[in-house]
Amino acid sequence: ENVLKGKHVGFSHFREEYIEHIAKQQWDNELLRHLSWDALHPWGLEEWKDFTINKGEDDRFLFAILENTTEEFIGWVSLSDVQLKNRGANLGIAILQKEQRGQGYGFEAVSLICKFAFYELGLHKIRLAVNSNNQNAIHVYEKVGFKKEGIDREALFQDGQWLDIYNYGILQKEWLQIIKAES
């Protein structure tokens, strides 16, 4: 059962059946280069289960992203480091399969998590960090309304070169203006 539902994707709580899918996809080089900024070792099913189902973190909301027609698990989206006093959180998202990227699922998932964060949690700001070479993700974030707030220069070493990490943010009032303008 979807917790939140958009036109093409919905969010659900994690189920054990999704974990094996994640474990298989964890070595997709294109996905991996944008998800992690450090050397990785493979996670087993138990580690993925701890990360998703037994998350045990009170300051994180983690949802499975499902395609609405097929109910196929296509990725995850999270709000982490949720701060009640400052009303902020960090956004993370992954669309697992290469053929599912570029289909608008990421845009809709980011829009849905913003709706959840601003309407349901009453957050003031959502932050994210993205590799400077991840142009597809940057396009999605800017299309949703995120603004570049800073650059962590040469913070990431990838393919023999130093890359910047861009820091983005969106305020509740900015998001509400965008939603109002679209309706």
Language-model region placement:
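Short glycine/proline-centered loop/turn elements that form peptide/ligand docking sites
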Residues: G106, V110, N133-A137, E154-D159
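Conserved acetyl-CoA-binding loop-helix of GNAT-fold acetyltransferases
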Residues: G102-F116, I138-K143
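Conserved active-site tyrosine of GNAT-family acetyltransferases
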Residues: Y141, F146, Y168
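Conserved hydrophobic/aromatic "anchor" residues
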Residues: F14, F116-F118, F146
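GNAT-family acyltransferases
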Residues: E1-E99, W162-L163, I170-S183
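Conserved catalytic-core motifs of GNAT/GCN5-like acyltransferases
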Residues: R127-V130, K147-L163
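Conserved GNAT acetyl-CoA-binding A-motif
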Residues: Y119-A129
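Active-site acidic-Proline motif in GNAT/NAT acetyltransferases
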Residues: Q97-E99, Q103, S132-N133
